[in-house]
Amino acid sequence: ISINMVGLEKNPGFKLTPSLIQHGLYALEFGDTFMRCLYRVRPYEKVPGSANALHEKWKKRVIDFVGNTKILSHRKYRKMCRQIIRDFDNLPMTDEKKPRVGVVGEILVKFLPAANNYIVDLLESEGAEAVVPDLTDFLLYCCYNQNFKADYLGATAKSKRINNMLIRFFEWLRKDARDELAKSKHFEPTAYIQDPAKI
């Protein structure tokens, strides 16, 4: 299945419904939150295996929530995002400092352990902390790039407006997670796409 904004491929028999879109967006944000929390905490856990155990506990709850066929409660989604971050933030951690290593590259290779030879596990076994950008950040980059295309490469002003609306939507969707990350002891909040774009 290919989902893209420019209609490169059609998917006969596959229909995007409002419910499916909502479930997919919530799953996306839960995945980003899990990745950000787990990779930050696991290298410093005082009790070996505690970060993975907490991840498994919350993963089951998230699957039960997102796996529901109905339209989901946005209030419950927001509450779950905040509670996941709080639980990871309160996991006992050591005070040691480890080198932080960024994992970047093509989307599939970056996010699928089997495609990157389990690079995060390797980095952690070698005494490092892996840092993987959120998948939402990639989507925001794609949307923000439309500004450049409209300003310099002949893309339409309408496409620019639509993509800027999408940016505001994604930022709204992860607002609760960002606010909770900002209040935490161990995490950094997600950046707004406009900030790295200025660099």
Model segments located where?
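An N-terminal assembly and electron-transfer interface module characteristic of large anaerobic redox
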Residues: 1-199
